[in-house]
């Protein structure tokens, strides 16, 4: 099985396209080291039913009561022909394990659970994260980061430039789950997640 990878750089974020792949075969050597000699032929596989897309994994902030579980939205998105982001509803195969979710506990008492991926595999591009209730009078927040590197989910192609400073699209997404508030933090005047590009 052969694979090829498109390098992610400052020119990578483009609309969907049909790949044009030419395979140049110079010679063939089998497992017994027998070779055909020089062939010099080019094969062009039919890629008319393929569509290459630029994607990312988006995870959103959420808040609510410390007495109930929270479901943090997490979805696979693609950069479409309109140059906007949309949920990749055709994705029903992307897998992520619970252990691929790294979290930082900033609750007033230790969080006795772990974030869990809801859909395994993705359901129409949606994975979501379940966070169980921390319990009465336990407030604060948990930062959740899906680890997309090969030491985690091994989904490098779903990283993105979340900080607006990475031309290689090599950053994991992060979101905050805040427990113990119902309508937002009264101390904060306004909060918004920044989406670069």
Question: Model regions: which residues?
Answer:
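Core sequence-specific DNA-binding domains of diverse transcription factors
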Residues: 1-197
């Amino acid at each position: 099985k052969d694979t090829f990878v498109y390098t992610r750089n400052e020119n990578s974020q483009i609309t969907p396209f049909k790949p044009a792949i030419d395979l140049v075969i110079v010679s063939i050597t089998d497992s017994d080291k027998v070779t055909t000699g020089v062939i010099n032929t080019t094969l062009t596989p039919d890629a008319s039913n393929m569509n290459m897309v630029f994607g990312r994994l988006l995870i959103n902030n959420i808040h609510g009561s410390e007495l109930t579980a929270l479901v943090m939205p997490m979805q696979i998105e693609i950069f479409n022909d309109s140059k906007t982001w949309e949920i990749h509803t055709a994705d029903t195969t992307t897998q992520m394990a619970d252990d691929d979710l790294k979290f930082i506990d900033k609750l007033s008492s230790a969080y006795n659970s772990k974030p869990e991926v809801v859909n395994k595999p993705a359901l129409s591009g949606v994975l979501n994260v379940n966070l169980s209730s921390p319990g009465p009078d336990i407030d604060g927040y948990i930062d959740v980061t899906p680890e997309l590197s090969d030491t985690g989910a091994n989904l490098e192609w779903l990283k993105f430039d979340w900080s607006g400073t990475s031309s290689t699209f090599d950053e994991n997404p992060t979101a905050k789950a805040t427990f113990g508030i119902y309508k937002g933090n009264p101390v904060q005047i306004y909060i918004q997640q920044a989406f670069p590009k």
